[in-house]
A protein has these predicted regions:
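Boundary at the C-terminal end of the N-terminal hydrophobic targeting segment
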Residues: 55-58
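Bacterial N-terminal signal peptides
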Residues: 42-50
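Bacterial N-terminal signal peptides that target proteins for export
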Residues: 33-43
Length: 513
């Protein structure tokens, strides 16, 4: 059950949004290990301490988009196109049995691989579909989108130890129909040296943690957040009712979060830096690179109030106007100082948030003044449906589904980074530490007020995207490119944007993240 606030519904105090279901998962998982009993106790206590004023409603099934008609989409429809020289592909013969679909793991030229995908043909699905893939020693369960028509790529990377050539694999489907007598195995050898410097580019505070906390934790990582997060919901109006004052407060709080929360992943505050540019403005800045763009909710044009949250010396905390050219210049400075071997950034084709899309554009423009090679790991925190990834906390993440009729998505490689239970726990509480992922002090304290249930305004606030469910998973998924590849990705994105009719700034999306 997901708990969602709604004015007019009866409400009561429960742990913070997402913590309820997540605690249930960790209670079951952690109780199996005697060495983590104290950690389980901490989880429960921290969850119960967070009294959140929200109303309980069961999670509603994700509706099939009206444009999707399973009869009009062929089962072999696949929007993904993989570079043939970047992975190893082989077809396998499927045998349909009463217990499920079975196949034999093939002999393949890639003897060492880190990521494995299995492409199966889905002829349609019901609500909450999932597919479980099992070997003799382990199994993984992946939840699919509700329409699930066409090729779906299942992530088998967690079964690596049980996938020797000749081993038997069983595929069991629930509420989804698998079609055909063949499937495709695709293996990736990324050969990433995670001991080398790693740079995470986050459009907003909390994006680095949602996408890549497991990957960046306990490494030589630098976290750079482009905006202060000074937009979105008016969470703190009890403390600051005037919009400019409110969003100045909210932006500063979130800027502080972006600097200190990575410490929970072993990254000290002097290696986390917030550039302080303005949330919800990147596309407007890109459209006129020299123009100074004010905040969404006020006249301020200086990023310095938000850079005061920084403690490191990556960039000076001095007055600087909010322009596109300044943003790109700052990213160039970051690249030259950090010299990363791996750069983690949004994928503008798969992430529907404008700030995420143009964050990728800014990074690629900065590459023109930084001539080193690097591996680029792209992510999406806002796939076309904010329900992705589907399924509960702790389950496996694979490629997001793409609406039929969308442009093809070219991928060089896929990289699945596994996160064990301890790392998932740390990620959970890093997310919970972010101000914008929990309810405000007024919303939490409203649990104690007699008229809580009679509020007629938008309190308790509805939080539509459950980032605790979506982000705390058995793995983090990335789309790996070389320098030329990521430049092509952004060039294709910009070409597609010239076809749209929306002027810059007309589509704000969810500016809160």
């Amino acid at each position: 059950m997901r708990f969602r606030g709604s004015a007019g519904n009866s409400g009561y105090c429960v742990p913070p949004l997402g913590i309820t279901t997540t605690l249930g998962f960790f209670k079951q998982e952690l109780s199996e290990d005697s060495g983590v009993n104290s950690l389980h106790t901490v989880l429960v206590l921290l969850g119960l301490l967070g009294c959140t004023a929200i109303a309980a409603q069961p999670e509603q099934p994700v509706e099939v988009p009206p444009a999707i008609n399973p009869h009009n989409v062929p089962a072999n429809h696949d929007p993904y196109r993989f570079d043939v020289d970047k992975s190893v592909e082989q077809s396998v013969r499927l045998t349909h049995t009463p217990e499920g679909v079975r196949f034999t793991w093939p002999h393949m030229s890639a003897t060492t691989w880190d990521t494995a995908l299995l492409g199966v043909k889905s002829a349609g699905a019901e609500s909450q579909p999932w597919i479980e893939v099992s070997t003799e020693t382990a199994s993984v369960r992946q939840f699919l989108d509700p329409y699930a028509v066409g090729i779906r790529w299942l992530n088998l990377s967690g079964l690596r130890n049980g996938l020797a050539a000749g081993s038997q694999v069983t595929v069991r489907a629930n509420a989804v129909t698998l079609q055909g007598d063949e499937a495709t195995v695709r293996l990736f050898q990324n050969r990433l040296d995670l001991r080398k410097p790693l740079l995470v580019i986050a459009p907003h505070p909390d994006d680095a943690e949602i996408a890549a906390f497991g990957l960046y934790a306990d490494r030589e990582s630098t976290i750079v957040t482009l905006t202060a997060g000074n937009a979105g919901s008016m969470n703190y109006r009890a403390q600051a009712a005037d919009p400019p004052e409110h969003y100045r407060l909210k932006g500063y709080l979130r800027a502080v979060d972006s600097v200190v929360v990575p410490w929970q992943g072993g990254i000290p505050p002097d290696r986390s830096y917030n550039l302080g540019y303005f949330d919800g403005r990147l596309d407007v800045m890109y459209a006129d690179p020299l123009r100074t763009i004010p905040e969404v909710y006020g006249p301020n044009t200086d990023v310095a109030p938000y850079r005061r949250a920084n403690v490191g010396a990556l960039l000076p905390n001095q007055s600087r106007t909010n322009t596109w050219n300044h943003l790109v210049e700052d990213i160039v400075t970051v690249l030259r100082k950090v010299n990363p071997a791996i750069i983690v950034m949004p994928d503008p084709r798969l992430d529907s948030h404008l700030d995420h899309e143009y964050a990728a554009v800014a990074v690629v423009q900065a590459l023109e003044r930084w001539d080193r090679e690097a591996t680029f790991l792209l992510y999406t925190n806002h796939a076309a449906s904010n329900h992705y990834p589907f399924g509960p906390t702790g389950s496996v993440v694979s490629l997001p589904s793409i609406m039929p009729g969308s442009e093809e998505i070219r991928l060089q490689k896929v990289f699945s980074y596994e996160t064990d239970r301890e790392l998932q726990t740390r990620k959970l509480f890093a997310l919970e530490s972010m101000h914008d992922l929990r309810l405000s002090p007024e919303e939490q304290s409203s649990c104690d007020t007699p008229d809580f249930q009679r509020r007629s305004d938008d309190y308790p606030r509805m939080i539509e995207e459950d980032y605790f469910r979506r982000a705390v998973r058995a793995n983090e998924i990335f789309y790996a490119f070389d320098r030329a590849g990521v430049q092509q990705v952004v060039a294709k994105f910009l070409a597609s944007m010239t076809k749209t009719q929306d002027p810059p700034g007309s589509k704000q999306g969810d500016s809160s993240r």
